């Protein structure tokens, strides 16, 4: 198979990934592959572009390194072209409502007829099967959080709140990426492809496991946090200093001992309530939990963030300033690791945003291209799979494909 023109880089060089989906979850999976060196083809509707394009800046991050194909994959010759593309594809990712592809005639079995080794990842809110009440429903970030038990655990004591920005989309996208790579490993070993059913609510159910396990195995439900503090443990969470906010985790025997000396509670060490070897202070079960919070709040409020960071570093207490977005790119750690970078958009502008992560030492990822325009690579992709200029123009004339204007 000849690949589309692009530099060779990263651990996934030579891999062809195709995705069909809008907004965040499914495309995020595809973009991870693209930043790690895979050739990634983004399928968009012919009549209207991905709704993410209406955003002024985010698409330049979320659709960089992609090849844009505008094709009606469910109708006539457009479907034929899509199935032809599948013959040279390693991984196909689709994000839709339940078994939408199967309902429109593109089943796993049809895809495997054209490519027995194909890895197929289906990403939806409620999965490919289940009850009719849920399976075919639309879902976004907040829907998956609400249905999974994740949302009810977040927020403040007075009200649950979803975790933003779009947590369920990103977790689900990364799940699709990792699951597809696991399936690809097996497919290359056996010659037999795989179909993966990723339900966003199940992803969030798994991510929300920490406290839910206590309920499933004893009926205890963790309360929501208060003012950003850990619902269980004193000295953990968000705290106010004299000049701003920090987060901290008071965990460990020596950390508690030394911190208690600083905040005036050394006399509690070795008591029945806080015996020697205590590694965490339970804010509910320990009768001194509220007192620890009171003393810690007072001590932190009397010190600047810089003073707290310096002292906590000496005590090996995990702590960080809550950075504002304007502070990020000048932070020395960000600068040293080039966590924020710049790249050129297709119209020649400079765009700034997060760099590629994680950092591969021997086969690093790279940004080689900005977000392509709607249908920008349609002709090149169709030529790559054997279509002539006349074939492409016929698809365009029938409204089954769109090429760049």
Curated annotation (Swiss-Prot):
The active site is at 169 (nucleophile). GO terms for cellular component: cytoplasm. Pfam families: CoA_transf_3. Homodimer. It comes from the Bacteria. HAMAP family: CaiB (MF_01050). Belongs to the CoA-transferase III family. CaiB subfamily. One of its GO terms (biological process) is carnitine metabolic process. CoA binds at residues 97, 104. The gene is caiB. This is L-carnitine CoA-transferase. One of its GO terms (molecular function) is L-carnitine CoA-transferase activity. Disulfide bonds: none annotated.
